[in-house]
């Protein structure tokens, strides 16, 4: 003990946390493991860190949405408040756009309809990265 904080799952079957393809039983939900990850993240970030991460996610998503609409190729599908995820309609070939994003080093949204993409922005994305993604449009 060096006075360092540690997190463990006590009395957990190891098989619960291996890949589903390799498991020999159906106990693969990983709920306990995900709960541990959330606990670790929240405790490491602290109250102020969580608030900052949420603010960065919100600001980044709204900035990306505004920039995409400003290209003239996107319209917002749901005209409602959002946190860090939003859906836009693209006036071009969505599959070709996604290929450009991948070639540029981005996972550029989830295709939710033939002409629609859902984007999510987290605190890890910078303004420069968002601008680079928009340039690929």
Q: For each predicted feature, which ranges?
A:
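C-terminal alpha-helix
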Residues: 136-137
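Active-site C-terminal subdomain of aminotransferase-like
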Residues: 1-72, 76-79
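Conserved C-terminal alpha-helix-loop-beta "cap" of PLP-dependent enzymes
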Residues: 48-132
